[in-house]
């Protein structure tokens, strides 16, 4: 599967001036697809709109080679179209441990959980836990290459499996 499924303008800021390792990112996801599945029934993405807030905190160990990174993701999903995600709230904590072998590379491992709560009796409720590992490499001052493997180890109202992701990230 590949393609564009949503457009998401985002804003990231540091809400507490003297706490540089805590930040918040807010985004508004606008779906640009009409159907959540392809002709073979494979899930592509939700067609719900989403307001998302992500809270980040990191701690670098004294050696400077290791970093503990935590994230709390919250999502409110809504819209007029039929979507499994409409009228749901997601609470998703994650913890990542990164190792920096040099100034351009990162190797990481993680555990994440996602809890989707239906906000009415027609809404979809779901949860899952994933573990995984990956890496990042800084190609230029602006462009990073990222790879990630995730194994979904448990869940309710979801299929278990794994995912392989590769991406380019531009940081301006």
Predicted regions and their residues:
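Flexible, surface-exposed loop regions and adjacent strand-edge segments
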Residues: 40-45, 86-89, 125-128, 163-167
């Amino acid at each position: 599967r590949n393609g564009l499924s949503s457009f998401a303008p985002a804003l990231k800021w540091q809400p507490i001036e003297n706490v540089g390792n805590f930040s918040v990112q807010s985004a508004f996801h606008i779906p640009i697809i009409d159907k959540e599945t392809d002709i073979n029934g494979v899930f592509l993405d939700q067609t719900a709109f989403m307001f998302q807030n992500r809270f980040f905190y990191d701690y670098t160990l004294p050696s400077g080679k290791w970093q503990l990174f935590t994230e709390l993701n919250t999502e409110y999903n809504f819209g007029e179209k039929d979507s499994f995600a409409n009228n749901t709230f997601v609470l998703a904590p994650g913890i990542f441990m990164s190792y920096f072998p040099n100034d351009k590379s990162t190797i990481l491992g993680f555990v994440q959980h996602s809890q989707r709560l239906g906000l009415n009796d027609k809404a979809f409720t779901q949860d899952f836990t994933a573990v995984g590992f990956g890496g990042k490499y800084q190609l230029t001052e602006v462009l990073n290459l990222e790879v990630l493997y995730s194994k979904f180890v448990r869940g309710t109202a979801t299929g278990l499996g794994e995912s392989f992701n590769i991406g380019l990230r531009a940081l301006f």
